Amino acid sequence: MSDDNKQDFKKGISNSFVWFLMAAFLFALMVQNFIDTKFAKVSFSYQLEHLVNLQLLQPEDSRKIALNDNLVTFSGKFRDRLTEEGKTRYKYLELLDTNHELKAEQARVKDEIKTLKTKVFDSASLFLQLSGLSIPKGGYVVVDDMYNTPEEDQSVVIKDLPKSAVESLVSLEKEYEAARQNPTAESLKNLGNLINELLRNLRSPALGIGSETIKQSLKGIDKEVADSGATSLSEQLAAYGHALVNLKAIIDELNHEEDHIRLAKLRSVRNYKETLDEYNQINTRLDDNQIQLDKARQSVSNVIWYFNNQELSTKALEKQDPEVYNQWFSKAKEEWANFSHNRGGIFRAPDQPLNAVLEKTFKSEEPSPNYFSYLFTLLPVLLVILVLYMLFARQMKGMGNTAMNFGKSPARLLNKGDNKITFKDVAGVDEALEELQEIVEFLKNPQKFTSLGGKIPKGVLCIGPPGTGKTLIAKAVAGEADRPFFSISGSDFVEMFVGVGASRIRDLFEQAKKAAPCIIFMDEIDAVGRHRGVGMGGGHDEREQTLNQLLVEMDGFDTNEGVILMAATNRPDVLDKALLRPGRFDRRVIIGLPDIKGRYDILKVHARRIKMDPSIDLMAIARSTPGSSGADLANILNESALLAARKGRTAVTAQETIEARDKVLYGKERRSLEIDENEKRTTAYHESGHTVVGLIVKSGDPVDKVTIIPRGMSLGATMFLPKKNRVSYWKQELHDQLAVLMGGRVAEEIFVGDVSSGAQQDIERATQLARSMVCKWGMSDKLGAVAYDERSEGGGQYGFGDHHEKTYSDETAQAIDSEVRRILDEALAIARKIILDYKEQVELLTLMLIEFETLDSEDIQEIVVKNNWDAVRKRERLKRAADLHKKEAATPPPPPPREVDISSSGTIPNTLGLSS
């Protein structure tokens, strides 16, 4: 009987109810623990500087546990109330910050006064010229010396006037008297023109009358003079006389002295007086602040402050950079304001870097295991796992066959406001942005186009090499229009299940129609848009079914629904023709590699977030990176920032940008490659030959640098800086370029007495260039302007590349070979003559390359052209470049006592400054 009762009791209580009781009990324990303890907001070690400086912590409760040499876990407790010493310290810091702000404001206003004073001189001089007033012996005083300060002369006195042809009121009065005695139509017409000219000058911005009453008076006089032109001579004369009387009254009103200032109704004078008043107010506030600061300084004269991981005296704290101090004080102000919340609270911060505050003020202790805290740490995780298990178990019971839900589109959606990229973040592709501006206008205001019966392009295909910003432009279009943006890759439609790709296409367009107007961006569309009928499955493979569905969706949805498909590819030649026809992708935007201006604009965009030295010339970087994409340029600046950080600099210098450019474009330096002295000397002669010939030829590009440091697959390199965008080649330029290519081989022959295989690439490039001159560009006098290089476009149905067909006779082939040989021999002769003429410079350049390994354009000019080379000056330049923006080494801690107990810590303090 008892067993039956037990079974009935078990049946009455479900497992879910038991789990609920356990979870409720554990949750109650957690809540009780959190209610009894007040936690403070301290998470980082840099906060401790302000907490210790302002005496917000109880020193006896401040402890740290060392995890390793650099990381600690610290804990502590806030005081229950502020100390008087802490209030005094905060008052001093606040006064010092205010002092910095007032001094900066004083300097700004002082500069503004200088600018306004010049404007007052100009407007007052123009007034004297227009009024005809004579300058007194002591000068015409605009602003009295009452506004002078012991340091600055703020008065404005005009002692002479510049020569000018403007008519004055005095001269007009004389003209009026002459016309009144003998009034004629000609004299009155001349008088009216002079009065109009005077009115224009008085109403001009150069004089700048700021009184609205005077402006209206001048406007009325102008109208009166204009209306009198159609009246009789006597009426004209009377109107002109009345106008001159009114102008005289206006001149007297402007010349009236008020509060030791004349011309107070001119904007320049009024602004000058207001700025003077502001300057005096700032000086008064600064004097009051200085008195309070001097008094507060006496109370904290013996305090040692923790400032950005340094220990500073009060005197040293006041010498810190005001901007750095302001940022530091803002954190202290925040901690001071948060004390009301943190009062009496405890805190604990794990895995924080060790700093001076932790080292000096926090007590060290050994970590003690707290198994009860482990339980509360793991308890939330266990509860989350339990809840997730119950949710998934319930879902799996009702899912059935819908578990394999592969037909949904995996497109990622950026809603309005999430996409912060606009056209301001895109540079170097101005033509592409102009093409896409119409798309943005449609997304912002569709009715503007549809009301007139116009149709917006249904599809936009962005074509360009990798890294030119196709995806970025698509995001910018969505961000500029502030519309939803669906992004997906062409490979996302390819799956192992039949029909998944077509299903995802349908689902993608359904989602897009619900969010219209919007943009669908399909990256690498060639993954699904290739020519049909060439796959492994004939016309029935999965990719072609996906393409067919895409074609139907593009041709099926209406433009008024506001769904625009943008796609990107760098292989437009493999796309299906049906995909490219008008009505689908009916607008193609070519995004090519940027030119010099484009590269410069791209560099400016990426340089915004990098702290760079002002001496860096972004245009020089743009000029030295022909053929680079936007991604390459961004990588160059990122590499330069990493190099600067590795060298311990506070800002990126020109040296890092050059190293980063060479690393990205030519490969990383291989300094570990073992090269004997003979090989190094031969490489130096080889590169010196290239350099000297490149400098001497008439049409060569300037030499940027020469190096014998192995990089990539080469043992050395001579780098040139193009003067302009290369859109075409001239015959003389090509001959000079061939001579430069032959310069390295000629230098080896002359100075080494032998030739090496290092000139292999030079000979290949020279031969290819000479053959192009003969066969493609018609630059051979013997063979004439005939193209012998017949190219057949491949890459069609079977994907074969381009191939060349020989369409000329064997005799012509021999003539081509002999002409190519002649051009190369001429280039060899030119290079040999230049090397022999500049033999001494080649020798010196070789020696300096062996010593310094790399020479820049300034060094090369001094050696080859100017003949004023100084190796000492070169070493000084290298030292200055190495020390530029170097971080100051931290002050080492004081040495420990002579007897050190290492039994507790297990380590010996590092007193020699050696890195561990």
From Swiss-Prot:
Transmembrane region(s): 17-37, 372-392
Keywords from the named record: ATP-binding, Cell inner membrane, Cell membrane, Hydrolase, Membrane, Metal-binding, Metalloprotease, Nucleotide-binding, Protease, Transmembrane, Transmembrane helix, Zinc
Disulfide bonds: none
Swiss-Prot/TrEMBL GO biological process terms: protein catabolic process; proteolysis
Chief place where the protein resides: membrane
GO MF terms, alphabetically ordered: ATP binding; ATP hydrolysis activity; ATP-dependent peptidase activity; metalloendopeptidase activity; zinc ion binding
Protein name: ATP-dependent zinc metalloprotease FtsH
Species of provenance: Protochlamydia amoebophila (strain UWE25)
